[in-house]
Amino acid sequence: VAELTPSGTFSARAIAKGLKPGLYAITDSHLLTGGRLLVAVEAALRGGAVLVQYREKSAPQPERLKQAQDLAAICHNAGVPLIINDDPELARRCGAAGVHLGQSDGSLALARRQLGDHAIIGATCHADLALASRADADGADYLAFGRFFNSTTKPGAPSAKPSVLTESRQFGKPVTAIGGITTDNGEGLIRAGADLLAVVGGLFNGDVATIEERARCFSRLFAQHHPLFSSSVPQES
C-alpha cells in the first residue's frame, strides 16, 4: 500500500509519524559484528523493513553516537523511521525519529518532553494489558508485547500469548510483537493482531543476502495477511 488511510490501530497521527504495518528490524551487536551493522540494515531496508531500532547498550558513547548517526542517514534516505532503544538523548543527538522504552528505561512523559510531540515513542508492555493501558495514557505511539517464542536475545523475558495482540487493539495504537519471531511463525501473530513484527535473530542471524530475503519474506506475510494490505484473506477463528 503506497499511502495508508486512517483505519483500525493506525490513526492519522500514527501515519503522519511514518508508522505502517510491517517488519520492525532490531539490531544486535552480538550478531552484527565486524562492521556489518550498516550493510545488514541496508539489506533489511531493501527487503522492505518499515521501522528500524538501534539497540546497543555496551559500546562506548562516541561509537554509539557515530553508529546511530550513520543509521539515521541510511534510514532517512530509505524513508524509514529510526528508533533508538532506551536513550532519548541519543535519539535527539543523532536525529532519530524516536525512542523505544522498556519498563525500566525511564519515563515516557520525560522522553516526550525531550523529543517533542513529533517523535515516535514505543513502550514495552510484556504480556500485560495494564501496562499497555498506562503506556497508552502516557502517550505511547505503539505498544510492544512479547516474548511469543523462545528468544536468544532476551531468554528471560516474560512469555505472552497471541490473544494479547487481539485484546490490545482496544487502545487504537499500532501493536508490535517481539520475541523469537521468524518467517515460519510470524503469520499467526499478524492474524492475531500484530501490526509490526519486531525481529532480531530471525532477521539478522545470517549473511547480507539472507537478511534481505528474510525481510522480503516478512514483507510478503504482511501483504498477504494484514488487513490494511488485504481484507480478502480469511481470518482464523
Positions of predicted regions on the chain:
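Flexible, gly/pro- and Lys/Arg-enriched active-site loops
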Residues: 103-109, 147-170
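Paired acidic/hydrophobic, glycine-rich loop segments that form the ligand-binding mouth/hinge
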Residues: 99, 197-198
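Flexible glycine-rich beta->alpha loop in the catalytic core of nucleotide-sugar glycosyltransferases
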Residues: 148-149, 195, 202-203
